[in-house]
């Protein structure tokens, strides 16, 4: 069995790790970073950029640079109204009602899983470069509070990236694995995970290699992006007061504000104030305008207090659902970059009555845990068992629009539950089964995961037919539902594919697109390498030509100069084969210089040897004399 990599597919950053010799290792990307920005961009030439290179051009290309796409994964268009306001790129309604991104530079509408797949491909390639072998399998993490549609979308993203997703693991659970891999004693741990776009809290019991999740809760609309947004709104307001100019509709200015807000937020975790300086942020009739502002930690904490407080209720619910008191918890682990905010650390202490444990790297713990889970699946990591839970209750709509729950939230997975229902009307020959996820009493107030029809039921008075509905949740938290008429034995099964999910044909098309992109990326890399080789040869040849111009014939010199000129002209074209052939021609032409350099070097060596009283070995006579002396010694 090959290596299974562990990927933390984050809202802001992603990270990849692998098990080596029983230890998890975080893999550096090609730029030397241990985490990679979860950013994908398309240039005006249609070139795709992923990671740091995409982040570097955000300000100048805001509408075609996609960040925080995780907020739109598996979501219907009407569910993301608040998220749309937070991003400069265009979100549209897809044909099946899901949220999609319109990318003007490639004139294409793309789904969130397709965009996330680009980041996963970068993670896959990072691991392949490190391991020196092809990678096809992965464990990918998701927020614990992700619903079925969001989990399925994540799995689809993996498939598009050419990865078989062996397991979907909840982020707090993965972090607990990273924390507890070498712990032997029993303890109860809370994982407080505040990332770029989501918040999760999970309570786990650890002991003897068993990691059992007791409860989980969270908010998939709360994360570091929201904290950045508060700073942005404040800066826009202050600038408007000062200059009477509203920056809220200037996409390029908003992108600069986004970068500055994120930087200030990070600075305020270690300093009492942060200076924000954005020269030439805009202009009016009087000339350019500059934004200068000093944000204090006290002001920042005042601005984001409502967000900090929003994390309290999920924590209290999780403690209650686990059947515990805050004092029963032995350790509180912080995960996610936003947990570095002092106000967050303070509320964690207030909720749990203890200082949080800072022994786990909040940026890498989730990927490390995913790698450990990969090791468990391959058998490389032994004596460890992970028992996770479903975050939300599952059920069906019954008479009167009520949600009847079959599986309660925080049930250990995998699990299966069945219940017998009947018809609501006389002579009813089919039933429409609506599958729901959520905690509300009425069906309409919960999320419809999907629906299917069981027909062919024999006509009978209402209440007579016996229809068994079975829910099956696999280890990834993905739901499978079946309905069976007990009288006829007729059965209907479905794996829930949300109404906002991708169809198999769409996924297949996206896989082909991703493969085409991989080919494009390969060609682009070849092109860059060919140009780099050519430029290097031109530089070396021109330098050598200058140095040895008096020692080579005018004909050779002219021939070399012509080849340099031809190669320079080919660099303006995108023809790799032409660049390579002309590079080879210049290489051959420049051999004349190499001969002169070698001859010059040989003469210099001979001169040095004579000065040291050593006879030169370059002449034929010298070689013979040396041979004869050696021969005499042998006699």
From Swiss-Prot:
Alphabetical list of Pfam families matching this protein: HSP70
Entry keywords, A to Z: ATP-binding, Chaperone, Nucleotide-binding, Phosphoprotein, Stress response
UniProt-listed CDD domains: ASKHA_NBD_HSP70_DnaK-like
Region (Disordered): 598-635
InterPro entries reported for this sequence: ATPase_NBD, Chaperone_DnaK, Heat_shock_70_CS, HSP70_C_sf, HSP70_peptide-bd_sf, Hsp_70_fam
Modified residues (Phosphothreonine): 198
Keyword Cell membrane applies: no
Induction section of the entry: By stress conditions e.g. heat shock.
Keyword Transmembrane in annotation: no
Biased composition regions of type Low complexity, renumbered to the chain: 601-612
Any one GO molecular-function label of the UniProt entry: ATP binding
Biased composition (Basic and acidic residues): 620-635
Job of this protein: Acts as a chaperone.
Family note: Belongs to the heat shock protein 70 family.
Listed name of the protein: Chaperone protein DnaK
The organism of origin for this protein: Borrelia garinii subsp. bavariensis (strain ATCC BAA-2496 / DSM 23469 / PBi)
């Amino acid at each position: 069995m090959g290596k299974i990599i562990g990927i933390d597919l984050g809202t802001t950053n992603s990270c990849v790790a692998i098990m080596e010799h029983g230890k998890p290792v975080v893999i550096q990307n090609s730029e030397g970073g241990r985490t990679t920005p979860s950013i994908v961009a398309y240039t005006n030439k249609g070139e795709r950029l992923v990671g740091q290179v995409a982040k570097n051009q955000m300000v100048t290309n805001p509408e075609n640079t996609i960040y925080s796409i995780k907020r739109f994964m598996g979501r219907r268009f009407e569910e993301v109204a608040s998220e749309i306001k937070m991003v400069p790129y265009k979100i549209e309604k897809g044909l099946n009602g899901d949220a999609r991104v319109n990318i003007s530079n490639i004139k294409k509408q793309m789904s969130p899983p397709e965009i996330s797949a680009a980041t996963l491909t970068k993670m896959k390639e990072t691991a392949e470069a490190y391991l020196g072998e092809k990678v096809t399998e992965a464990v990918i993490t998701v927020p614990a509070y992700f619903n079925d549609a969001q989990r399925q979308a994540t799995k689809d993203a993996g498939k598009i990236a050419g990865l078989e997703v062996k397991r979907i693991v909840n982020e707090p659970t993965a972090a607990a694995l990273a924390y507890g891999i070498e712990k032997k004693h029993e303890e109860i741990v809370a994982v407080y995970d505040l990332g770029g776009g989501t918040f999760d809290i999970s309570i786990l019991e650890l002991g003897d290699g068993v990691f059992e999740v007791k409860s989980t809760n969270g908010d998939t609309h709360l994360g570091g992006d929201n904290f950045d947004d508060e700073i942005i709104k404040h800066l826009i307001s202050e600038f408007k007061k000062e200059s009477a100019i509203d920056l809220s509709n200037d996409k390029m200015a908003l992108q600069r504000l986004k970068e500055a807000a994120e930087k200030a937020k990070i600075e305020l975790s270690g300093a009492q104030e942060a200076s924000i300086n954005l020269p030439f942020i805009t202009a009016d009739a009087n000339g350019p305008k500059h934004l200068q502002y000093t944000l204090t930690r006290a002001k920042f904490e005042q601005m984001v207090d409502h967000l900090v407080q929003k994390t309290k209720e999920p924590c209290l619910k999780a403690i209650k659902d686990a059947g515990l008191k805050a004092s029963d918890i032995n350790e509180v682990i912080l995960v996610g970059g936003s947990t570095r905010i002092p106000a967050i650390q303070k509320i964690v202490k207030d909720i749990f009555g203890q200082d949080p444990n800072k022994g786990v790297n909040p940026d890498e713990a989730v990927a490390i845990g995913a790698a450990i889970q990969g090791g468990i699946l391959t058998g490389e990591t032994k004596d460890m068992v992970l028992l996770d839970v479903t975050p939300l209750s599952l059920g069906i709509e019954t008479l009167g629009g009520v949600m009847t729950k079959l599986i309660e939230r925080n049930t250990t997975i995998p699990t299966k539950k069945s219940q017998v229902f009947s018809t609501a009307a006389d002579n009813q020959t089919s039933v429409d089964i609506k599958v729901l996820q959520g905690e509300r009493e009425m069906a309409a107030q919960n999320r419809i995961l999907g629906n299917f029809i069981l027909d062919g039921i024999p006509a009978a008075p209402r209440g007579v037919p016996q229809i068994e509905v079975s829910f099956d949740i696999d280890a990834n938290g993905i739901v499978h539902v079946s309905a069976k008429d007990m009288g006829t034995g007729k059965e209907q099964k479905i794996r829930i594919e949300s109404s906002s999910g991708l169809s198999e044909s769409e996924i297949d098309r996206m896989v082909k697109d991703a493969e085409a992109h991989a080919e494009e990326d390969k060609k682009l890399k070849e092109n860059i390498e060919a140009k780099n080789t050519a430029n290097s040869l031109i530089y070396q040849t021109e330098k050598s030509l200058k140095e040895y111009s008096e020692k080579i014939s005018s004909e050779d010199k002219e021939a070399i100069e012509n080849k340099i000129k031809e190669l320079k002209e080919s660099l303006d074209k995108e023809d790799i084969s032409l660049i390579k052939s002309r590079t080879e021609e210049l290489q051959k032409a420049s051999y004349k210089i190499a001969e002169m350099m070698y001859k010059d070097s040989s003469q210099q060596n001979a001169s040095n040897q004579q000065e040291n009283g050593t006879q030169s070995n370059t002449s034929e006579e010298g070689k013979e004399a040396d041979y004869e002396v050696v021969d005499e010694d042998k006699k």
